[in-house]
A protein has these predicted regions:
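Alpha-helical transmembrane segments and their membrane-interface exit regions
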Residues: 48-51, 74-81, 167-174, 217-229
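Short juxtamembrane and helix-loop transition motifs at transmembrane-helix boundaries
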Residues: 1-8, 29-37, 60-65, 91-95, ...
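Alpha-helical transmembrane segments and their helix-entry boundary regions
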Residues: 39-42, 53, 68-69, 96-100, ...
Length: 231
């Protein structure tokens, strides 16, 4: 039985709770520099947790708009990889649907998508929209509320809330890793993880961190493909 929009919403609800906590943290951190309306516009148009945290830091440092745009672009380059992989399940979807799915795809909704792929080979367009939209609404709402509440705190940075996004990614990776153990060989996973870790560390000596993340991800994908081809 194919899953519909509301089943996509239900499947993504646990992740949406994570959006709320991280979004509140993002809003609180941004409160000294942005109004709730400005935060709402940022979340609607940018909609990228890591990029928004970076933008807030750059705003606090009075960085140029060009620098912010380039930083956001580099941070979000990884979305191209996720979108390319996800698009294989929606080849027959209309242009409007594919644009909608690609625009709202995040690390978290991609994680939910991968978890669903472990259960079924058929991912429907309505289910994917439900998966994406619940996070979008939760993120916008949480960041705006966080910005409004943050104005009541004397020093939001003292709470270390900017680490919340990292903590969420660790949780998502741990859950995804457990799922991969059911379908992938341990040797392959270890080879991929080792390739990503070593290449990322070495690349940091030559390129910026966002580029190192992207390049290490590509190297990890290449190693995974090679290992699968040999097995």
């Amino acid at each position: 039985m194919e899953k519909d929009f509301w089943q996509g919403v239900r499947d993504a609800l646990p992740t949406a709770l994570g959006y709320i906590s991280i979004g509140l943290a993002c809003g609180v951190v941004a409160s000294p520099y942005l109004s709730p309306l400005e935060m709402a516009l940022m979340s609607i148009l940018v909609y990228a947790g890591a990029a928004q945290f970076a933008m807030i830091s750059l705003i606090a440092a009075h960085s140029s708009i060009l620098n912010m745009a380039l930083t956001v672009c580099l941070i979000n380059l990884r979305n191209m990889l996720m979108s390319l992989h996800t698009s294989t399940d929606f080849k027959d979807a209309s242009l409007a649907h594919t644009i909608g799915i690609g625009s709202l795809l995040t690390d978290e909704s991609y994680g939910v998508y991968l978890s669903e792929k472990l259960k079924t080979d058929t991912i429907t367009v309505p289910w994917m929209h439900g998966n994406n939209l619940v996070g979008y609404v939760a993120w916008i709402s949480a960041t705006v509320i966080g910005t409004a509440l943050g104005s009541l705190l004397p020093d939001p940075k003292a709470f270390g809330l900017d680490f919340a996004l990292v903590a969420m990614f660790i949780g998502i990776f741990a859950a995804q890793f457990q799922g991969m153990q059911l379908t992938e060989k341990t040797k392959t996973m270890l080879m991929v993880l080792l390739a990503v870790a070593v290449s990322f560390f070495l690349l940091l000596f030559f390129v910026s961190q966002p580029l190192a993340v992207l390049a290490a991800t590509l190297i990890g994908c290449f190693v995974g493909v090679v290992c699968d081809a040999r097995e």
